[in-house]
């Protein structure tokens, strides 16, 4: 005799309907770790997590290395899946071929799609998402939605009409509302680069551009802040703070420090020292010197300069011999009590 569950399942017009306990949409999300532990923490709350299916928005002012972070994630996805491709929607045209190669990305595995307006992006991306199967390995990068006009705005310019465009936010909201179910059902990560603007007021804060629709649809939203990394008077790169504005895994308003240098891109072990100092896993015995702290005896390891703390040899023993991974998880992931304040970590980064 057919059970009521079997009857409902057989009668469903949705071919992916499944008993919840067996549904592939409610299994643990497949995460792709990047090479940078603190980027994984910012994405998932764990050094072992990473890029997951769904929409990740990287927002910030111009020249905040937003595309760098997007390509770091996309490169990790290609490295993990040998048959994966990047669907790259480009409205900025600011990424030369050498930029992709810097992140170890084979440009023959990228479908480059230039876009001029929101509607063009919407029609193409929905057609692509319709055609992709759940087993296809695809990661989508949009660079950027911040600079994308609506079709109406372009038509008004061509017809020499100087009226305000009220359709852009609505078009973007519709675009992401349509994309979101596909990303989950077809297991696709999508990374969208966006701009921010400052709200008006005595204490202005950064607002993600493009209206509220992006907020509702996104799984992760980062707002990137930065300061110069100087050696004497020479700028070597930038110290970034990833401000987690929204996340399914990470506590909102978390602050995660990351360093990016001119010559080496995103520094693999950056941000870890700031957390280790705040949590007592490392210390600063004297100005300009750092040392790991033995958690059972309190003894200090060898004193090293800052550059040596960006090396694998400094971190391997800390990860292997202490509960530093758990400290990071408790500090950043939802459902755990933070052990130190976020501001304390960022103060260490500033110091």
Can you name each region flagged by the protein language model?
Residues 3-109, 127-130:
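The Walker A/P-loop phosphate-binding site
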Residues 91-93, 115-117, 145, 195-196, ...:
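Short, ordered loop/turn segments at secondary-structure junctions
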Residues 103-110, 156-165, 206-211:
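A short alpha->loop->secondary-structure connector
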Residues 115-187:
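Phosphate-binding/switch loop-helix module in NTP-utilizing enzymes
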Residues 165-279:
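Phosphate-binding/switch region of NTP-binding enzymes
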């Amino acid at each position: 005799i057919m059970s009521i569950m079997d009857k409902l399942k057989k009668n469903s017009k949705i071919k992916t309907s499944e008993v919840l306990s067996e549904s592939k949409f409610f299994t643990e999300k497949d995460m792709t770790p990047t090479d940078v532990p603190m980027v994984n923490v910012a994405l998932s709350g764990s050094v072992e997590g990473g890029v997951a299916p769904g929409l990740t928005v990287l927002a910030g002012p111009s020249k905040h290395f937003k595309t760098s972070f997007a390509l770091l994630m996309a490169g990790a996805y290609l490295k993990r899946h040998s048959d994966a491709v990047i669907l790259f929607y480009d409205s900025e045209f600011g990424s030369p071929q050498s930029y992709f190669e810097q992140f170890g990305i084979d440009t023959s595995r990228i479908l480059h799609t230039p876009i001029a307006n929101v509607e063009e992006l919407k029609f193409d991306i929905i057609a692509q998402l319709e055609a992709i199967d759940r087993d296809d390995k695809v990661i989508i990068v949009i660079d950027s939605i911040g600079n994308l006009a609506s079709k109406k705005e372009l038509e008004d310019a061509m017809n020499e009409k100087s009226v305000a465009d009220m359709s852009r936010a609505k078009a973007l909201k519709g675009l992401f509302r349509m994309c979101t179910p596909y990303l989950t059902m077809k297991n696709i990560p999508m990374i969208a680069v966006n701009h921010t603007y400052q709200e008006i007021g005595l204490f202005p804060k950064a607002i993600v551009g493009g209206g509220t629709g992006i907020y509702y649809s996104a799984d992760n939203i980062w707002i990137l802040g930065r300061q110069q990394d100087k050696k004497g008077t020479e700028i070597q790169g930038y110290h970034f703070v990833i401000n987690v504005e929204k996340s399914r895994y990470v506590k909102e308003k978390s602050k995660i420090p990351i360093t990016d240098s001119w010559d080496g891109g995103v520094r693999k072990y950056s941000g870890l020292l700031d957390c280790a100092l705040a949590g007592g896993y490392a210390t600063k015995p004297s100005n300009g010197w750092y040392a790991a702290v033995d958690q059972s005896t309190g003894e200090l390891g060898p004193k090293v300069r800052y550059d040596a703390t960006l090396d694998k040899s400094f971190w391997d023993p800390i990860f292997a011999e202490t509960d530093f991974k758990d400290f990071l998880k408790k500090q950043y992931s939802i459902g755990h009590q933070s052990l130190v304040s976020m501001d304390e970590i960022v103060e260490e980064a500033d110091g």
